[in-house]
Regions:
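Small-molecule kinase domains that catalyze NTP-dependent phosphoryl transfer to phosphate-bearing small molecules
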Residues: 6-9, 94, 116-183
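Hydrophobic positions on the alpha1 helix immediately C-terminal to the Walker A/P-loop
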Residues: 16
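Active-site signature of alpha/beta-hydrolase-fold catalytic machinery across serine-
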Residues: 19
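Post-Walker A helix-loop "phosphate-sensing" segment adjacent to the P-loop in P-loop NTPases
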Residues: 22-29
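ATP-dependent small-molecule kinase phosphotransfer cores
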Residues: 33-105
């Protein structure tokens, strides 16, 4: 099963992804990870080329105020610069190649879809799309946060209550998806 997660900053995308990795044996990928590696290479933040993608998250190197600036830089470099230079689907293509090269797991989750072209790219590859709605999301004006409002996913789940409630909603959806996947 291949899942594509859509949601604004703070909606619960990583929470959902981490839960599916632990409970349902999914392998997680993120389009934004490659933006982080690109920035890392360009700025020499990390010097150890043997660092595993899952061992360190570059944004953890920054304090809260710097993280806000870092997010803005990621958006500017990943969207405003690289997509213009290399094409809109550059991060989709790189992530897709990583999935094909590095994963034998048939349960794949991409947990950071933000644009219509990303959605369309992975829908063509039979990904099931899930949008997370959360009333407490941070309001941001970058296209990566606004354009996703136009995406009509296969499923919508809400994350407005406790973490336990969110897990119950995820379990309910997974039961439905697994049952449908078997038929």
């Amino acid at each position: 099963m291949k899942l594509l997660i859509i949601g604004k900053a703070g909606s619960g995308k990583s929470t959902l992804s981490n839960y599916l990795v632990k409970k349902y044996n999914f392998k997680q990928f993120a389009l934004g990870d490659n933006v982080k590696y690109f920035i890392s290479d360009m700025t020499n933040i990390l010097h150890n080329i043997d660092t595993n993608i899952n061992e360190i998250k570059i944004e953890e190197l920054f304090d809260v105020e710097t993280k806000k600036k870092y997010r803005k830089h990621m958006q500017q470099i990943g969207t405003d610069l690289c997509q213009k230079w290399f094409g809109k689907t550059v991060w989709c293509e790189i992530t897709n190649k990583q999935i094909k090269t590095n994963s034998t797991n048939s349960n794949i989750i991409i947990d950071d879809c933000r644009f219509i072209h990303e959605y369309e790219y992975f829908k063509k590859q039979n990904y099931i799309s899930i949008k997370i709605l959360n009333n407490r999301c941070l309001l941001m004006n970058h296209s990566s946060e606004l354009e996703q409002d136009l995406i009509e996913p296969d499923y919508i789940i809400e994350n407005n209550n406790s973490i336990e409630d969110f897990y119950n909603i995820i379990d309910y959806l997974m039961t439905k998806l697994l049952k449908h996947n078997l038929n």
